[in-house]
């Protein structure tokens, strides 16, 4: 959690993400993704695009807002209302995908959320880290297809 606290400081985190053409962004992605994806050509292309995108004015600020809101909102009324609403089980079907090598979203907390999504489908993406949709798009698409076929009770093409 120290990184979450560092993101609360104004301006510095944005500068950190954009400095040296987005080198910090690349470091974060590498720390949260699988070695197999990093070794591929797709990773080099993707990381190049991400490093360019983080340089767009306000992109770094927007990328950090989720972490800022998650920390700060706990002290405000909106955060308390959000947390109350999240304690109720959801009645809609949910697909929760997680890379089995994700060091950021851990398996145990994910498994504890099952009580809130009784109609949920939880799937682990083998060999993927935090960016499963980028690292293993075929597996993710297969899971999405199966989920949609289950929800709509018919084949999805």
Q: Where do the language-model regions lie?
A:
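Flexible "cap/lid" subdomain of the alpha/beta-hydrolase fold that forms the substrate-access gate
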Residues: 1-124, 145, 150-152
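Catalytic histidine-centered segment of alpha/beta-hydrolase-like enzymes
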Residues: 128-141
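C-terminal amphipathic helix plus adjacent low-complexity
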Residues: 154-157
């Amino acid at each position: 959690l120290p990184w979450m606290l560092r993101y609360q400081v104004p301006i510095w985190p944005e500068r950190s993400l954009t400095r040296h053409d987005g080198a910090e962004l690349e470091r974060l992605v590498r720390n949260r993704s699988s070695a197999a994806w990093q070794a591929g050509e797709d990773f080099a292309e993707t990381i190049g695009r991400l490093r360019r995108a983080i340089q767009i004015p306000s992109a770094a600020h927007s990328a950090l807002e989720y972490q800022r809101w998650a920390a700060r909102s706990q002290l405000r009324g909106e955060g308390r209302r959000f947390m109350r609403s999240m304690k109720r089980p959801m009645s809609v079907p949910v697909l929760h995908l997680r890379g089995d090598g994700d060091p950021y979203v851990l398996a145990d907390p994910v498994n504890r959320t099952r009580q809130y999504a009784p109609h949920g489908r939880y799937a682990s993406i083998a060999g993927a880290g935090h960016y499963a949709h980028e690292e293993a798009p075929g597996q993710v698409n297969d899971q999405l297809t199966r989920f949609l076929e289950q929800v709509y009770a018919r084949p999805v093409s």
